[in-house]
């Protein structure tokens, strides 16, 4: 009886461990392999709109024909046309600059929240996540009304006589950065707050006892201890911003072509699934790099 209970418990423990891996296989690995397969195919006027299609009913010959029909032409297309390289570089530039802006804005906010009275902290956290209760698309559309020529921002600036004529905020990089910072600020603030809130206050007291002024204690104690939160917040912002489509499409101009817009055009307008899939594969490979670097740093910190 005890042996059977131990067997059941052992199976249950293995099942619990296997569930996350099963989740990754079903919702990440299999979809990625499908996208990778399409990226190695050729565009066709068919359904689905690419060839070759694996025909298992043909047996081994069908598999050989399928493999022989795969090539790297779509990736060569990405290298031959400058528009794709410019889109990737623009996306990485916007993501990097936006992440830095979010860090400079989010760190003081998170620090203030972590130092606020305990009862007030819950209210502040709720205020940070409150925008998520509204549709993302509606929030972006609201910025169109705010940033347009006769919008709220221009009216306020003119009322304070800071500008004489309305500024063309829309269809510019400035509008994109405003929309991104507004939309992704909670993703930076919450990891930073979680890290700063758990910090041991006695470390700052010890630094003060040793004669360190508050600003020096902040840079030597608080900042290093908050780096895991900085890294987590940066990843949570940088990765989705790189593939952002809605904000640059609604707030940006023709000179603000990001890779998400290029992918959407290839997939829906040009109906070129293989090239769109190749764009997605390259984008994923680019985003794996910062994730791997962050994981490597985390491993070194734990080992150290």
Give each language-model segment a name.
Residues 4-6, 193-208, 274-304:
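C-terminal transmembrane helix and the adjacent membrane-cytosol boundary/short C-terminal tail
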Residues 6, 62-63, 140-181, 215, ...:
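Membrane-interfacial helix termini and adjacent extracytoplasmic/periplasmic loops
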